[in-house]
Curated annotation (Swiss-Prot):
Part of the 30S ribosomal subunit. Contacts protein S5. The interaction surface between S4 and S5 is involved in control of translational fidelity. HAMAP family: Ribosomal_uS4_B. Keywords: Ribonucleoprotein, Ribosomal protein, RNA-binding, rRNA-binding. One of its GO terms (cellular component) is small ribosomal subunit. The lineage of its organism: Bacteria, Bacillati, Bacillota, Bacilli, Bacillales. CDD domains: S4 (cd00165). GO terms for biological process: ribosomal small subunit biogenesis; translation. This is Small ribosomal subunit protein uS4.
């Protein structure tokens, strides 16, 4: 399945979650798009709820179905709770960490920064958004990319960095200190529904 490339605003309103991370999509119209959006009261089936939750998380991270399912399967082979492991793996992706450090205003921008080669891990350029970080690894912006407006503006307005990360705004240097705990990740996602979806 290809990555969704339509309107993130409409998709955010349909799923009830901000896919950009800014929350602007839901400020004025916190309901589904379309003529009947404000009055939609359709009750979803159990399968519908599971599917919607899966789509929310997949679109949030901008992943193809194959990438998403592969990560889910990897999480299932780890010790611990499958759903929580899955959420932690997603949050440990390089593009997700670049976004969480405040180097990009949206997750899509973070994917682009990584994909275009603006980011280094432990001093080596990494252009794979799905690159999985390990505790202790250092994320930096390449020297020739540090004056990009998109990065400077993002860092300037960002006022929160999760506790599992460390960030020096002056040097644009971040450290993946540890794996996040579930409580530090998106609370609007019910990952158990996703586990149930793939267990059908």
């Amino acid at each position: 399945m290809a990555r969704f490339r339509g309107s993130n605003w409409k998709k955010s309103r349909r799923l009830g979650i901000s896919l950009s991370g800014t929350g602007k999509e839901l400020e004025k119209r916190p309901y589904a798009p379309g003529q009947h959006g404000p009055n939609q009261r359709k009750k979803l089936s159990e399968y519908g709820l599971q599917l919607r939750e899966k789509q929310k998380l997949r679109y949030l991270y901008g992943m193809t179905e194959r990438q998403f399912r592969n990560t889910f399967d990897i999480a299932g082979k780890q010790h611990g709770v499958h759903g929580e492991n899955f959420m932690i793996l997603l949050a440990s992706r390089l593009d997700a960490v670049v976004y969480s450090l405040g180097l990009a205003r949206t997750r899509r921008q973070a994917r682009q920064l990584v994909g275009h080669g603006h980011v280094e891990v432990d001093g080596r350029r990494v252009d794979i958004p799905s690159y999985s970080l390990k505790p202790g690894q250092v994320i930096t912006v390449r020297e020739k990319s540090q004056n990009l407006d998109i990065i400077k503006e993002s860092v300037e307005i960002n006022n929160f960095v999760p506790e599992y990360l460390d960030f020096d705004a002056d040097s644009l240097k971040g450290t993946f200190v540890r794996f996040p705990e579930r409580s530090e990740l998106p609370a609007e996602i019910n990952e158990q529904l996703i586990v149930e979806y793939y267990s059908r």
